[in-house]
Amino acid sequence: MPHTTTNKGLHDFVDDRVLTDYARTGVRAVDLGSGPGAMADRLRRWGCDVLAADLSADGFALDLPHVSVNFNEPDFASKLGRNVFALVTAIEVIEHVETPIGFLRNIRELLAPGGVAVLTTPNVDCLPARFKFFLSGKIRTMDEHGEPTHISPVFFDLLYRQYLPLAGLRLRQHLLFPQNGFQLSRKSVAWIMRLAAHVVPGESILGDNHIFVLESCA
């Protein structure tokens, strides 16, 4: 299995809870931001016809087709194929791009009729993130202690009301990982936050990551 730097268990969770519904033998799939190939490998094991795509193939560890593409380009979908993929995956990618809505529009262009896209991104709506912003004015996983290439936080409310309609997409399924807590917080903090989550109102209180299953509005 290729090495990955995403939260431990996230790929397995997506595999078990999402890909089981959409990945099938012969399904044409593209993995955006493939990195070393952790998700592309899972798609391959499901029997999908997989294309991997990232800024470069450096470190890509699989014997699969790979296309080098810059996701900040306004029409990167044209390099991969329009309306041909039944399954698009982008695991922890959208937070790295300069224009999330443009990225989503390209995903819509990639989708074949009836296809779905599976995206994950840090949950900046979760309770620890809300406390961090309240106390410091900084966004969890995106401050000076976080990943330096995280530049575009995705808030669920904005995604649902603004980003997706503007991109021509709609939400089919929304999951959170982990479902009952937090991996990125210290154990003592995570315990307190889990207790507080029972009384604090709001969407997406638990979980370090959003998982979105999207489909075209057309």
Each language-model region and where it sits:
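A short His-aromatic
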Residues: 92-96
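Conserved class I S-adenosyl-L-methionine
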Residues: 119-140
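A short glycine-rich, Lys/Arg-flanked "PGG" loop and its adjoining helix->strand segment in the class I
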Residues: 102-113
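A SAM-dependent methyltransferase catalytic signature shared across enzymes that methylate proteins
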Residues: 159-175
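Short N-terminal helix/helix-N-cap motif within the alpha/beta-hydrolase-1
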Residues: 98-102, 129
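Short conserved AdoMet
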Residues: 24, 98, 112
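Conserved N-terminal segment of class I S-adenosyl-L-methionine
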Residues: 1-83, 87-91, 101-104, 119-121, ...
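Acceptor-substrate binding/catalytic loop of class I
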Residues: 140-159
